[in-house]
Amino acid sequence: MPRERQKRGRRAEAKRKRDDEVGDRTAPKRQKASEGDNDFNPLHSQAKIGDDYIPLEEEPASSMDTPFYGLLDPDEQEYFSHASGLLELNQFETEEEKSIFIERVYEEADGKELKIACSQSCSRLMEKLISASTVSQIKSLFNKFVGQFLNLVQHRFASHCCESLFLRAAPYVTLEMKKKSAEKNDNEGEDSSANLRLEDLFLAVLSELEGNWGYLLTERFASHTIRVLLLILAGEQLDNPSKATVIASRKKENLDKPKVTQRDKSASDRRAVPPSFNAALEKMMNDLVTGLDNTYLRALATHPVGNPVLQVLLSVELTHLGKSKARDPDSVFRRLVPDENLEEGSESAAFIKGLFYDPVGSRLLETMVQLAPGKFFKTFYKALVQERIGSLSRNEIAGHVVARILERLSKEDLKSSMDLILPEVLSLVKRSRFTVIKTLIERGVIRGVDLRPLADSLLLAFGTDPIARINNVLKLHHLNEENDDTKRSSKNSTPEQLHGSLLAQTMLKAPGPLSELIQSSLLAVTLETLIAIAKDPVASHVLQDALTLPTSTIQFRRQITSRFSGKMAELALDSSGSHVVDAVWSATENLIFIKQRFAEELLANERPLRDSFVGRAVWKNWSMDLYKRRRGHWIAVAKGLESVNPSNSENRQPPKSNLDLARARFAEKSNTSTPKKITATF
């Protein structure tokens, strides 16, 4: 092993010398590459390159400048890898046992934190430790990293540890604000790291990174950390699923799943943050873009690394700094779109039109459409979208922006936009591009727009034959081919099948002809196809919604549920079909005879159901133990008159009739009426 490290060192040293020798020749080549950009060629050549101006193609400085914190020896690697496996299994009997184990791992890692964070095999352990650490352990680890954050956030593995540390520490900053006086008395006998405030530690990180924002903005690892810091300073709810793609890339494994329930849940959308965070946020945002000219800032819109940071900057600016900030000529929003009128041929109009069709830039445009002030959105819609919304919806990339635009339209504008999109429905269906159609249905239901013209267009596009129609929507021909081979999973489904299932679910939520298109198709398919749909992890959601949504009439539920007779046990033993069986319970609330017949079928297959994990879940959800022992009570539960728990059902009363409700209203009215005053005579 020492010999191998020696060889790597010699090769790296030789490479560094070669880079130094040809350094003068590489700079013009990079300048030439940046000048070759067709969009920004003239302005790039005129720009004065300063410390914060970094060409998009430029690589970071030599890796020899990055400090080396050392390697773990084989025994240490084995120990920490074993500890990582135990944390992954999470088979501790009590939380106290787990806390003791984590404390022992921290003791073993004392002095080796930087080595572990930079280790390919052990950095995951650090992330898992952070996700289960107490506030004192978080402060101690934070203190160990202080002074090294500039290098850690640029490291391939340590950057993930920094993100986990920041995300874990953010809720405790809010708690510290509420317990300032209490902590002063409680921490008198603790070590110095416990006396540190997380607020001060976060500010120390910002001061350490200050002066390097221009480079870190497009650094592929540090850019994630910048996004996290911006959201923390702004007080965003970090466990919000909508922030998941903003915080981390799609390739990052979701190691934080168990800690979502541990975080402090707040009823409001924003966390309370100290006043120092607000000042630090404004300073950080100014420093990020101060050294960048407008040309470079717009180039970030199509940069795969800089674009997500620009999205966060824009969203924080428009949501936390006030809508008036958008009128500031020095704001990020106005520097991207300086023209208010967006006239044809203007610089801003050309920039926005280019974002429509760019796979990276369109995401920034979606953010602008969602958060822009109403005055700008109206100008933007009338000048660049209103007449072109039909052609824009045809494009695979621009269609996502159109969906965001439809979410902000009024009823009249939505109706006129639908009229322009209807001629494109046939081509959209052929290409399985359902995003615009799905959003049009959702917004039409909310705004109260008549969706019958859209239903007619979908009927022509998918076919008048109900069986062929459901095949075209859910791509059932792929389903039938794979049904005879291996067991399918949602990961094996194609994007066309997923989008088709989502479209069908959206259609079922719309009352009237749209939901009837799917319901009639489900009734027309053969029993084998219906069971295949129920067992498919993607298509089964359509069947579940068809059984439970308010748009399904009692006649439809009676017809569709009766088709499952003789197949309930088979579905209950399937991972996807078991959810359909649970939906049948809700669908047959007013169909007690059908529900009893299905319960008898499940009772006849008690042993296989109890031996299966999903079968036991169905057995419990159908209250089959109650069905075996107290049939009368089960019938009351099946009708919704009583709960499964007898203690809760004692106070439960049957629903009142219309006559009882009228009597109650009359009695309430009599009690609230003011009595007549009777004057006493003496």
Curated annotation (Swiss-Prot):
One of its GO terms (molecular function) is RNA binding. GO terms for biological process: endonucleolytic cleavage in 5'-ETS of tricistronic rRNA transcript (SSU-rRNA, 5.8S rRNA, LSU-rRNA); endonucleolytic cleavage in ITS1 to separate SSU-rRNA from 5.8S rRNA and LSU-rRNA from tricistronic rRNA transcript (SSU-rRNA, 5.8S rRNA, LSU-rRNA); endonucleolytic cleavage to generate mature 5'-end of SSU-rRNA from (SSU-rRNA, 5.8S rRNA, LSU-rRNA); ribosomal small subunit export from nucleus. Coiled coil: none annotated. Pumilio repeats lie at residues 108-143, 347-382, 383-419, 524-562, 563-600. GO terms for cellular component: 90S preribosome; nucleolus; preribosome, small subunit precursor. It holds the Pfam family PUF_NOP9. Gene3D superfamilies: Leucine-rich Repeat Variant. Residues 1-46, 249-272 are annotated as: Disordered. Residues 1-15 have a biased composition (Basic residues). Residues 16-35, 250-272 have a biased composition (Basic and acidic residues). Keywords: Nucleus, Repeat, Ribosome biogenesis, rRNA processing. It is found in: Nucleus, Nucleolus. Its main location: nucleus. RNA-binding nucleolar protein required for pre-rRNA processing. Involved in production of 18S rRNA and assembly of small ribosomal subunit. Belongs to the NOP9 family. This is Nucleolar protein 9. It comes from Ajellomyces dermatitidis (strain ER-3 / ATCC MYA-2586) (Blastomyces dermatitidis).
